[in-house]
């Protein structure tokens, strides 16, 4: 294993999301309790918290208002190694585990969900290469994300007719000699228009259903890759969601991820991790709104005293804080299980995504209510957080779908 990755004064050397090795003292070390952090994790989170407050928070309103991609944050993340969080150290990445990266996303989500989503989608775009790629494919692509690289990735699965029902996708990949020719369309692809490297799902044999889907790595500049328009969104406007078109696009056979026909299994595996990242972002949004609401109640005076002294306000704040804490603990349990490769990880992860995103929607709505007219105004930012929270109930699987999957898993475990 190569030497440690440095975050300024902080040195970290850990095992990645995929490593089966264990180290005695690493950022990814598991403790006996879910809440206890290693010293390295504490230092990392202090650094991320300072970065979020000083560099990201002041730009959040502008990013939302202007639909501006957070270039400044991307460059800072690149300098700190945060653009390759899950890439194993031996490939030049940071080598974080799922739990640590989830905590990073929560901290950034507190101040700017667009920036958190950009970083989340960056990790998602690499997941299938890390989890399922051959050694040759990993060697070809993963080192390119090290050394302060600003290369961006995207996870391209959703199509106009294939959202919750991903088996309905129409994109096709036909093998011709030592290449695959891809034709089709993707939509709502997070980071799509800024991505340099895409992981793309397509059917290689539609007659086989789930066993006929495969995964490919596609690079920007490949003839036949066409970037469509960016969507105008309700929230998280700084992170683009884009159309992608593939017109007789040729990729070398070596860019097949894993084995042909196993793409759907790879997709489900990646989504089980994506969902806990979404949940972590949701907890961050909720925490950020809660903190702003609490501060407002201490400063806003009505009836001759701060509204924090009013019992109805105290009840609302108590419920909001309880719900956020419960969501955080459920997310931590899910990430801990996923890091341990426990078979319950995907089940608890789905629960965490559902509960945390519903919590974010409720808490941000209540934050607007607690702050009254001020909460409805842009400068106080909780209205933005309310709009951002909505997406967490939709992406990586709507909460109706995640509830259905959870229910089936509990009732029919076989």
Curated annotation (Swiss-Prot):
Its cofactor is FAD. The active site is at residue 124. Cyclohexa-1,5-diene-1-carbonyl-CoA binds at residues 164, 211, 275, 396, 408. Keywords: FAD, Flavoprotein, Oxidoreductase. SUPFAM superfamilies: Acyl-CoA dehydrogenase C-terminal domain-like, Acyl-CoA dehydrogenase NM domain-like. FAD binds at residues 157-158, 164, 190, 398, 400. InterPro entries: Acyl-CoA_DH_CS, Acyl-CoA_Oxase/DH_mid-dom, Acyl-CoA_Oxase/DH_mid-dom_sf, AcylCo_DH-like_C, AcylCo_DH/oxidase_C, AcylCoA_DH/ox_N, AcylCoA_DH/ox_N_sf, AcylCoA_DH/oxidase_NM_dom_sf. The keyword Repeat does not apply. One of its GO terms (molecular function) is flavin adenine dinucleotide binding. GO terms for biological process: protein tetramerization. It comes from the Bacteria. Mediates the conversion of cyclohex-1-ene-1-carbonyl-CoA (Ch1CoA) into (E)-2-cyclohex-1,5-diene-1-carbonyl-CoA in biosynthesis of cyclohexane-1-carboxylate, a by-product produced during fermentation of benzoate and crotonate to acetate. Also able to further convert (E)-2-cyclohex-1,5-diene-1-carbonyl-CoA to benzoyl-CoA. Belongs to the acyl-CoA dehydrogenase family. Homotetramer. This is Cyclohex-1-ene-1-carbonyl-CoA dehydrogenase. It comes from Syntrophus aciditrophicus (strain SB).
């Amino acid at each position: 294993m190569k030497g440690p990755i440095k975050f300024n004064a902080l040195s970290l050397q850990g095992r990645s999301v995929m490593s089966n090795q264990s180290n005695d003292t690493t950022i990814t070390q598991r403790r006996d309790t879910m809440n206890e952090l290693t010293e390295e994790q504490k230092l990392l989170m202090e650094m991320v918290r300072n970065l979020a407050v000083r560099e990201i928070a002041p730009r959040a309103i502008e990013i939302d208002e202007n639909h501006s991609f957070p270039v400044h944050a991307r460059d800072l993340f690149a300098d700190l190694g945060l653009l390759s969080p899950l890439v194993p150290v031996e490939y030049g990445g940071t080598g974080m585990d799922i739990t640590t990266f989830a905590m990073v996303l929560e901290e950034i989500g507190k101040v700017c969900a667009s920036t958190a989503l950009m970083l989340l989608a960056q990790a998602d775009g690499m997941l299938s290469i890390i989890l399922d790629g051959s050694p040759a494919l990993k060697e070809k692509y993963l080192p390119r994300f090290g050394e302060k690289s600003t290369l961006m990735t995207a996870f391209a699965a959703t199509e106009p007719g294939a959202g919750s029902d991903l088996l309905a996708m129409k994109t096709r990949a036909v093998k011709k000699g030592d290449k695959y020719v891809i034709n089709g369309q993707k939509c709502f692809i997070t980071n799509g228009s800024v991505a340099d490297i895409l992981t793309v799902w397509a059917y290689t044999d539609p007659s086989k259903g789930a066993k006929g889907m495969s995964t490919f790595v596609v690079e920007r500049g490949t003839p036949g890759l066409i970037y469509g328009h960016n969507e105008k969104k309700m929230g998280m406007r700084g992170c683009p969601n884009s159309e992608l078109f593939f017109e007789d696009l040729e990729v070398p056979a070596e860019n097949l991820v894993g084995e042909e026909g196993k793409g759907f299994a790879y997709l489900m595996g990646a989504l089980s991790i994506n969902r806990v990242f979404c949940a972590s972002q949701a907890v961050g949004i909720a925490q950020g709104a809660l903190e702003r609401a609490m501060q407002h109640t201490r400063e806003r005076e009505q009836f001759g005293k701060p509204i924090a002294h009013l019992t109805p306000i105290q009840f609302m704040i108590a419920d909001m804080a309880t719900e956020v804490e419960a969501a955080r603990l459920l997310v931590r349990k899910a990430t801990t299980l996923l890091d341990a490769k426990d078979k319950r990880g995907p089940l608890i992860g789905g629960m965490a995504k559902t509960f945390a995103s519903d919590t974010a929607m409720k808490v941000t709505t209540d934050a607007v209510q607690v702050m009254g007219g001020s909460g409805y105004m842009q400068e106080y930012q909780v209205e933005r957080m309310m709009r951002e929270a909505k997406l967490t109930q939709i992406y990586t699987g709507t909460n109706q779908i995640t509830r259905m999957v959870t229910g089936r898993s509990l009732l029919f475990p076989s």
